[in-house]
């Protein structure tokens, strides 16, 4: 306050700074000036001895506040009576509420309880994480209707010799052809040098009399017509691709042979595709 009053300029005549001492443990803001003297201080023997009772009599009886203004003294509050001391009894265990009792007697029980809670929590979190991962992985797998269409069984006795039967498998047409002996000998005699996509007939079949193909043209994905074309196999009317009875491209814009799916003969009269 003294520095404020000194720098106030024209308001200095109306400003005043006062320092009041309040009993407490803190130091005052402004130190009182002590006159310089060479004489030793004289003890006042008549001053009463400051005991606990005399100090309590000098203690502050009411709350102190700090105020600053014009032409008023400034005071500082060194005591806060509205501050509550924190009490953590609600967070402490009953075994350690008594401060006069040693906590070593109950340390084993408290540690065992903490370990048990930690173990149960870890198991629960691991189980929940396992379920979450399982559901996430299963959501990326194929649905039940797709799995049902993943494989198809074809009864071969329903397909007469020299005929081709079409099925729907995984959203695509599936051709199952029962070839005659003449077609088998004709396709086996084709030289690989004459083929755009060289592949021997025996490499495309497991049984010479049965040809199983995916009926999708390798040009632009059209569906060829069976028992048609210049080579008596399959013909795509969209752009004029000709395939033989083994599904090999012989003429037209298609670059590759018809695809052969994975299949297995479970018996002489049954084949499983997929």
Swiss-Prot record:
- The transmembrane segments are 104-140
Q: Which residues bind [2Fe-2S] cluster?
A: 217, 219, 236, 239, 241
Q: Which reaction does it catalyse?
A: a quinol + 2 Fe(III)-[cytochrome c](out) = a quinone + 2 Fe(II)-[cytochrome c](out) + 2 H(+)(out)
Q: How does it sit in the membrane?
A: Single-pass membrane protein
Q: Which residues lie on this side of the membrane: Mitochondrial intermembrane?
A: 141-274
State how the cofactor is bound: Binds 1 [2Fe-2S] cluster per subunit. Fe-S cluster delivery to the Rieske protein is mediated by components of the iron sulfur (Fe-S) cluster assembly machinery that reside in the mitochondrial matrix (including HSC20 and LYRM7).
Q: What is its EC number?
A: 7.1.1.8
Cell location:
Mitochondrion inner membrane
Query: What Gene Ontology terms describe what this protein does at the molecular function level?
Result: 2 iron, 2 sulfur cluster binding; metal ion binding; ubiquinol-cytochrome-c reductase activity
Mitochondrial matrix-side positions: 79-103
Q: Keywords on this record?
A: 2Fe-2S, Disulfide bond, Electron transport, Iron, Iron-sulfur, Membrane, Metal-binding, Mitochondrion, Mitochondrion inner membrane, Respiratory chain, Transit peptide, Translocase, Transmembrane, Transmembrane helix, Transport
Q: What is its main location?
A: mitochondrion
Cystine links in this protein are: 222-238
**Which prosthetic group or cofactor does it need?**
[2Fe-2S] cluster
Protein family per UniProt: Belongs to the Rieske iron-sulfur protein family.
Other comments on record: The Rieske protein is a high potential 2Fe-2S protein.
Q: What is this protein called?
A: Cytochrome b-c1 complex subunit Rieske, mitochondrial
The organism of origin for this protein: Colobus polykomos (Western black-and-white colobus monkey)
Which gene codes for it?
UQCRFS1
